[in-house]
Amino acid sequence: KFFNPGDWRSGYYRDQSWMLASAVTTPEQFFSQLYGDPNVEHDFHSVGRNMNSHYATKNRDQNGNWAALTAQLNTAADMAPTAGQMPRALGLAAASKTFRNVEELKEFANLSNNGNEVCFCTIGDASTSEGHFWEVVNAAAVMQEPLAIFIWDDGYGISVPKAMQTTKASISEALKGFQIEQGTNGLNIYKVKAWDYAGMCEVFDEGIRLARQT
C-alpha cells in the first residue's frame, strides 16, 4: 500500500507475504524458487541460483538498456548473510537523495522521480545485533536519508529469546537515543503490533511520508 513504483526494497527471506501482496512475485514463482527451477520463465528472481524467498527485479532489459525503474516496484537481489541488506539499503536511499540534489542527474527521469523514492529495508530482530545494522542506523540518522527500516520482532532469533541478545529485550528501547528531536538529527522510531492493520497503516502513512520529504 505504501510501497510505490520507483521505490526500492532491500530485504531478507521473510518478506514472502509482502512480495506476494505487491505482485512482485507469484505463488508459482515461489515454488519454482523452492525447487531451484533454472527456467527464467518460471523464476526470473534468481533462475534457480539462489535460495527460496530471495527476490530481485530487473534493472535492465534484454538489450542492456536501463529499465524504467520509476514505473516498477524495485527490489535489490536478496542476500543470505544476516544484516547484509543494511549497507545496500543505505546506498539505495542515498542514491535517491542524490538524484534530488544533483542537477546533472535530472535528465535520468526513468531512474528517479526527482529523488522522491524511499528505500524499504526489512530485518529480523536477532540480526539487529550485527554491526552492519548499527553502522547503517547511525549513518542514516546523520545523513538524513530516505530510508525506512522495518524490524520484524517475533521475540526469538535462531531459537534464542531476545532478552539474551538485545539490550532491554527490545530493539526499539535500545534505539531510543536515536529518536529525532527538534533541532537535532536522528530517526523517527515507531512501535506497532503486526496484527493491528489499521494501526500499521496509520504509522506507515506518517513514517513513509516523512521519509519521502527527507
Where are these regions (language model features)?
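Active-site proximal loops enriched in glycine and acidic residues that flank catalytic Cys/His/Asp
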Residues: 151-153, 193-196, 204
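Structural signal for short hydrophobic segments within the conserved structured cores
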Residues: 187-191
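Structural signature of the thiamine diphosphate
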Residues: 197-214
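Glycine- and other small-residue-rich loops at beta-strand/loop junctions that grip anionic moieties
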Residues: 80, 192-193
